[in-house]
Amino acid sequence: MMDSGNNNMNRAKRNLDGNDDDQPERKRPAFASVIVEALKVDSLQKLCSSLEPILRRVVSEELERALAKLGPARLTGSSGSSPKRIEGPDGRKLQLHFKSRLSLPLFTGGKVEGEQGAVIHVVLIDANTGRAVVYGPEASAKLHIVVLEGDFNTEDDEDWTQEEFESHVVKERSGKRPLLTGEVYVTLKEGVGTLGELVFTDNSSWIRSRKFRLGLRVVSGCCDGMRIREAKTEAFVVKDHRGELYKKHYPPALNDDVWRLDKIGKDGAFHKKLTAEGINTVEDFLRVMVKDSPKLRTILGSGMSNKMWDALVEHAKTCVQSSKLYIYYAEDSRNVGVVFNNIYELSGLISGDQYFSADSLTDSQKVYVEGLVKKAYENWNLVIEYDGKSLLDLKQPQRLSITHTNLENYSTAAIDHPMQMVAGHSSSMPPNQSPVLSDFAIGGYDQTLATRYHSHPQLLNSNPRAQFEVASCSTSQDQFMGNLHQTQSTINNQHMNGLALGPSQSSTSGYQNINPSSVHQADLNHLEDWSNPRERGPDDFFSEEEIRLRSHEMLESEDMQQFLRLFSMGGGGNGSATHLPEDGYTFPSFLHTPMQGYDEDRGRSGRAVVGWLKIKAAMRWGFFIRRKAAERRAQIVELDDDDEDGE
């Protein structure tokens, strides 16, 4: 028994010892784990330290908002919130408004300006009437400019309370300068104020909405007892000034680099593709877009989506155009041409001295113009460049802009004071003056002299003694100037309408009506009828006796006699009377025989030639009237003598 008990005790001891041997030892942490845990604790402590100022500021702001809401309630003894709409004692509802939009984007350190550099105006209005408040103490209130959160009151037509406005005012970050510096106060004058220089010192990326607004409120203590609703601008982003070097321009300028346009990054793929094709500026981009838009789209490739393309084109079209113009003349008629602006876009059509905008053309005219535009793009080297300031000042004329009164005034002035007309014409046309664009009227190479003098009304002498009809003068020129017509046939072939003289006819004392349109029959096309004068009837002419009397008065004037003496001395080579023609006067050789390749660009000399021929024609007509009058007087005297002999 004793042995068995000992055995059991020994077995139990072995089992107990064995259990102790089988139990695993406690796992010791690795050295790396200890390091990681230590770093985590340290990082957490640093995070808490960095979050503490932020948490303190948030708590402080929330407490300020809560106290601001509780303050008015305690003063008024009401626990409800303030009403949304508050009117003054006189029933007016006063509101501040920004009348100018900001120039975006804004950068830190940059001046806050209106669109295109304009100043920013604010106004105080009465919302009930929509009119500005120009009287009363509120019209000269002092205002404070503050920065608001971008998500404050996105609805433009929604009112807000003063507490709501104050709760969204943004303060500067801890340790930073004031968020908005400069002239943060403005005083109204008759209800209108102008913002001074304002500068942001910090970007808007650190607030929840990542955008700012400018707010405007009445300074505390001003206009007490009167509610004036605050003003706010649209939400905008303020970027760091380091990105200003790469900012886009709104609107872009013609000479801006092409990467200033939306969707084209500097030194990006699109930028490199455009520069490889010689498209370096915004003006180059617009010109290619107007002339061949599919080509430009192909250059940019499939990497630019349709949405990006639309945004790019829309931004480019906001570019401000210059006054430069380009004109392409039709091959068959040198007084008809199409006008392009500086980006090669069709602006209108010129015919004679008239300008027609592209919007005013009829369907048939548009078909003709489209053909000219296509030819102009194919032969751009033939397009002539002009300064478009004179064209921009034009008033678009009616269908008939050259009146008979203008032609009469010119003819009268040319006969009464020919030297003044020629001297004035020469001095008023500089050597580089274009024959197409004058100070007032725009005409082509077929422009008549009367039309050109129409652009210089100060040169025309309106003499009431000589308001005879131009049709009579033209008839006389056609009847008695056949020799001049033969001499100037070369210039007539060059489409100089001022020299379109009819064939030589017999010298008769009668005057017959001539249809003015027949004179220009060789040069007519379907566009030139816009500027042709109407026909004149026989009843519109002066009588022969009245014409004779008035021409006699003109020729007997002192100015005309001095003019004739001058030409008598200068003509014929030596001024001898033996060299005078039958009319008693000679003319100096001002007109040289034109060569076969007459240069159409010699606008000034061409106009001078036309001027001298007009004067010579008018004078020859006067000489003919005097000669015929003398012959008639001689015939009357002879008949009287015969009657006396018969008696």
Swiss-Prot record:
Its main location: nucleus. Residues 155-278 are annotated as: DNA-binding. This is Calmodulin-binding protein 60 B. The keyword Transcription applies. It comes from the Eukaryota. Keywords: Activator, Calmodulin-binding, DNA-binding, Nucleus, Transcription, Transcription regulation. It comes from Arabidopsis thaliana (Mouse-ear cress). A motif (Nuclear localization signal) lies at residues 12-19. InterPro entries: Calmod_bind_C, Calmod_bind_M, Calmodulin_bind_N, CBP60. Disulfide bonds: none annotated. GO terms for cellular component: nucleus. Interacts with calmodulin (CaM). Transcription activator that binds DNA in a sequence-specific manner, likely 5'-GAAATTTTGG-3', to promote the expression of target genes. It is found in: Nucleus. One of its GO terms (molecular function) is calmodulin binding. Belongs to the plant ACBP60 protein family. The gene is CBP60B. The keyword Mitochondrion does not apply. Residues 1-26 are annotated as: Disordered. Expressed in leaves, stems, flowers, developing seeds and root. Residues 8-85 are annotated as: Calmodulin-binding. Residues 1-10 have a biased composition (Polar residues).
